[in-house]
């Protein structure tokens, strides 16, 4: 039996059946619901109608008629409105295509992942192809990737419009010829002025191709030539432009002393020079003059086997403003050469003496006494360095990065000296065979350490790595 409800409407029945209680339909249109017999809401509870909905007071909302409560259309309001009439709802794009959200989201993906995500839809591609997402990245294009093979067997140069849309300012071309470079210049819309850095690796570029490239691509200020054996020193004389500020030449068999003469005379604004050439001698370094002394701040002489202390003399007198110097692999440089560096290049912040087998602890004493601004020191494979040398380095309050890979005479006692270097952020001890677990465990005192490399260290045990994870939680330990 039913009883009258609100405003005389009949109240629906509420009868238990098979342990279920059927609730009356709600005016919100959600339909009936049921509660199982075992739930606290229905157990030992009399069958009651749902409580009437609580409505806001008249001062906060306009009263609704029975027609409105029943879901029917509202009649037009009579009298003055109690508040401003809301406008139509603002339509927002779906979250998956909301550019504001996507602009923040895509920062969390790597370059490779961005390339894949750009294929999802046009909206994602439009957002991802903004140059800000690709700043600092350099596309690497191999010769075979520059052409599409047509059905007839002919080759067609690929469309580079996608690279132009992303605003790439540098490219690395691998295995290309003079013709490939000309095609690249003709087909990339930003090649004339927009490209600032070019790298050619293992390519057959000739003197003529190098000259055409630098003449056509007027924006290039950073140039790298690696493994290019078909250009000669004459090509450097005919093509190098004064606008170039960074030059790297490595594994190019025709590069010798005369190439340095061309570089020193044609590049007055050169700020960074990296040279890896087995045939360069001390004579080449004599070509540097005070003209480069004002602009050049970085010099890397990599595996220049013929350079001796005499060449170092020319460097320190001609380039007094160097802040970064690498003599890596210059195997004829001795402690006397390092003394010249320490006494004359007081602005150095980075010094690389790796693979210099004649360097001893005495060289480290010169470094510690005179290079008070030094922040990075690389001593990999300096096999004559001992604990005594590390005791000299422990006085350097500015040193932040120290590399001692494969320094086979360093022992636990030397590590104790390093524990006083609170400024250290990066320490590499990879391949040091005499370090024990006990000696390495003391490194937990360097609480500011951010990176510790211990690959190929016999004393680096799983238990030690667990110990580091507990006591150096902010440090990346490379096993």
UniProtKB/Swiss-Prot annotation:
Omega-N-methylarginine PTM positions read: 92
Summarize the protein's role: Substrate-recognition component of the SCF (SKP1-CUL1-F-box protein)-type E3 ubiquitin ligase complex.
Spans of the LRR repeats? Answer: 244-266, 267-290, 319-343, 345-369, 371-395, 396-420, 446-470
Q: What name has this protein been given in UniProt?
A: F-box/LRR-repeat protein 16
| Statement: the UniProt record of this protein carries the keyword Repeat | yes
User: How does this polypeptide assemble, per the annotation?
Assistant: Interacts with SKP1 and CUL1.
The annotated region (Disordered) lies at: 1-94
Query: Which intervals carry biased composition (Pro residues)?
Result: 47-60, 73-92
The encoding gene is Fbxl16
- Which InterPro entries does this entry report, sorted A to Z? F-box-like_dom_sf, F-box_LRR-repeat, Leu-rich_rpt, Leu-rich_rpt_Cys-con_subtyp, LRR_dom_sf
Q: What range(s) does the F-box domain occupy? A: 94-139
Supply the alphabetized keyword list.
Answer: Leucine-rich repeat, Methylation, Repeat, Ubl conjugation pathway
Q: Which PANTHER family match?
A: MITOCHONDRIAL ATP SYNTHASE COUPLING FACTOR B
Keyword hit for Transmembrane helix = no
Q: What is the scientific name of the source organism?
A: Rattus norvegicus
Q: Which GO terms describe its cellular component?
A: cytoplasm; SCF ubiquitin ligase complex
Q: Which GO terms describe its biological process?
A: SCF-dependent proteasomal ubiquitin-dependent protein catabolic process
